[in-house]
Protein backbone atom coordinates (compact mmCIF):
# COMPACT_ATOMS: atom_id res chain seq x y z
CA UNK A 1 0.00 0.00 0.00
CA UNK A 2 0.97 3.68 -0.27
CA UNK A 3 1.57 5.55 2.97
CA UNK A 4 0.48 9.15 3.46
CA UNK A 5 2.05 10.66 6.58
CA UNK A 6 1.04 14.01 8.04
CA UNK A 7 3.53 15.04 10.73
CA UNK A 8 1.76 18.31 11.52
CA UNK A 9 -1.47 16.58 12.47
CA UNK A 10 0.15 13.40 13.75
CA UNK A 11 -1.53 10.76 11.62
CA UNK A 12 -0.79 8.35 8.83
CA UNK A 13 -3.05 6.70 6.33
CA UNK A 14 -2.61 3.74 4.02
CA UNK A 15 -4.02 3.84 0.51
CA UNK A 16 -4.34 0.88 -1.87
CA UNK A 17 -1.53 0.60 -4.43
CA UNK A 18 -3.87 1.32 -7.34
CA UNK A 19 -4.30 4.85 -5.95
CA UNK A 20 -0.70 5.62 -6.98
CA UNK A 21 -0.64 8.67 -9.26
CA UNK A 22 -4.41 9.07 -9.07
CA UNK A 23 -4.66 11.10 -5.89
CA UNK A 24 -3.96 14.75 -5.22
CA UNK A 25 -3.79 16.09 -1.66
CA UNK A 26 -4.56 19.60 -0.46
CA UNK A 27 -3.69 20.51 3.14
CA UNK A 28 -5.32 23.37 5.03
CA UNK A 29 -4.31 24.24 8.57
CA UNK A 30 -5.64 26.61 11.22
CA UNK A 31 -9.07 27.15 9.68
CA UNK A 32 -11.19 29.75 11.45
CA UNK A 33 -13.85 27.24 12.35
CA UNK A 34 -14.67 25.53 15.64
CA UNK A 35 -11.53 26.80 17.45
CA UNK A 36 -9.14 26.12 14.62
CA UNK A 37 -9.71 23.03 12.56
CA UNK A 38 -7.56 21.39 9.93
CA UNK A 39 -8.73 19.82 6.71
CA UNK A 40 -6.87 17.52 4.35
CA UNK A 41 -8.68 17.06 1.03
CA UNK A 42 -8.07 13.99 -1.14
CA UNK A 43 -8.95 14.42 -4.82
CA UNK A 44 -9.19 12.02 -7.73
CA UNK A 45 -6.57 13.91 -9.74
CA UNK A 46 -7.85 13.21 -13.30
CA UNK A 47 -11.37 14.36 -12.37
CA UNK A 48 -10.09 17.42 -10.51
CA UNK A 49 -7.76 18.33 -13.40
CA UNK A 50 -10.80 18.10 -15.66
CA UNK A 51 -12.49 20.81 -13.56
CA UNK A 52 -15.18 18.48 -12.23
CA UNK A 53 -14.65 18.45 -8.49
CA UNK A 54 -13.12 15.07 -7.88
CA UNK A 55 -13.13 15.22 -4.08
CA UNK A 56 -12.92 11.66 -2.70
CA UNK A 57 -13.04 12.61 0.97
CA UNK A 58 -11.72 14.98 3.59
CA UNK A 59 -9.82 14.19 6.76
CA UNK A 60 -10.97 16.71 9.36
CA UNK A 61 -8.77 17.11 12.42
CA UNK A 62 -10.28 19.24 15.18
CA UNK A 63 -9.26 19.94 18.76
CA UNK A 64 -11.51 18.34 21.34
CA UNK A 65 -13.96 15.47 21.19
CA UNK A 66 -16.39 15.13 18.32
CA UNK A 67 -18.77 12.37 17.31
CA UNK A 68 -20.49 11.23 14.15
CA UNK A 69 -23.75 12.67 15.50
CA UNK A 70 -22.04 15.94 16.35
CA UNK A 71 -19.25 16.48 13.80
CA UNK A 72 -17.27 19.73 13.52
CA UNK A 73 -18.30 20.11 9.88
CA UNK A 74 -21.98 19.59 9.09
CA UNK A 75 -21.76 19.16 5.29
CA UNK A 76 -21.41 15.59 4.06
CA UNK A 77 -21.16 12.49 6.23
CA UNK A 78 -18.44 12.11 8.88
CA UNK A 79 -16.98 8.98 10.45
CA UNK A 80 -14.64 9.20 13.44
CA UNK A 81 -11.44 7.40 12.39
CA UNK A 82 -9.14 8.26 15.30
CA UNK A 83 -9.17 10.03 18.63
CA UNK A 84 -6.25 11.27 20.70
CA UNK A 85 -6.06 13.20 23.94
CA UNK A 86 -6.30 16.50 22.08
CA UNK A 87 -7.84 15.80 18.70
CA UNK A 88 -10.59 14.00 16.87
CA UNK A 89 -9.91 12.80 13.33
CA UNK A 90 -12.89 12.30 11.04
CA UNK A 91 -13.21 11.08 7.49
CA UNK A 92 -15.89 13.13 5.74
CA UNK A 93 -17.44 12.40 2.38
CA UNK A 94 -18.64 15.24 0.14
CA UNK A 95 -22.32 16.10 0.09
CA UNK A 96 -22.52 16.79 -3.64
CA UNK A 97 -21.62 14.96 -6.86
CA UNK A 98 -17.85 15.00 -7.34
CA UNK A 99 -17.42 12.50 -10.17
CA UNK A 100 -17.42 13.43 -13.85
CA UNK A 101 -20.88 13.72 -15.34
CA UNK A 102 -19.48 14.20 -18.84
CA UNK A 103 -16.90 11.41 -19.07
CA UNK A 104 -18.03 7.85 -18.17
CA UNK A 105 -14.43 6.57 -18.03
CA UNK A 106 -13.46 9.27 -15.55
CA UNK A 107 -16.59 8.62 -13.52
CA UNK A 108 -15.77 4.92 -13.37
CA UNK A 109 -12.18 5.60 -12.29
CA UNK A 110 -13.46 7.89 -9.52
CA UNK A 111 -16.05 5.34 -8.36
CA UNK A 112 -13.44 2.58 -8.21
CA UNK A 113 -11.45 4.61 -5.68
CA UNK A 114 -14.54 5.54 -3.66
CA UNK A 115 -15.41 1.84 -3.47
CA UNK A 116 -12.24 1.31 -1.42
CA UNK A 117 -13.16 3.82 1.25
CA UNK A 118 -13.63 1.14 3.93
CA UNK A 119 -9.99 0.15 3.47
CA UNK A 120 -8.95 3.76 4.08
CA UNK A 121 -11.17 4.11 7.15
CA UNK A 122 -9.61 1.04 8.75
CA UNK A 123 -6.05 2.13 7.88
CA UNK A 124 -5.80 5.55 9.52
CA UNK A 125 -3.54 5.78 12.55
CA UNK A 126 -3.07 8.74 14.88
CA UNK A 127 0.28 8.96 16.62
CA UNK A 128 -0.82 11.63 19.09
CA UNK A 129 2.34 13.53 18.19
CA UNK A 130 1.10 16.77 16.65
CA UNK A 131 3.33 19.64 15.66
CA UNK A 132 0.58 22.24 15.95
CA UNK A 133 -0.40 23.14 19.47
CA UNK A 134 -4.07 22.88 20.43
CA UNK A 135 -5.73 26.23 21.05
CA UNK A 136 -6.08 26.87 24.75
Go through each PLM region and give its residues:
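Surface-exposed amphipathic alpha-helical segments
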Residues: 91-136
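Short, solvent-exposed coil/turn segments at beta-strand boundaries
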Residues: 17-18, 83-88, 94
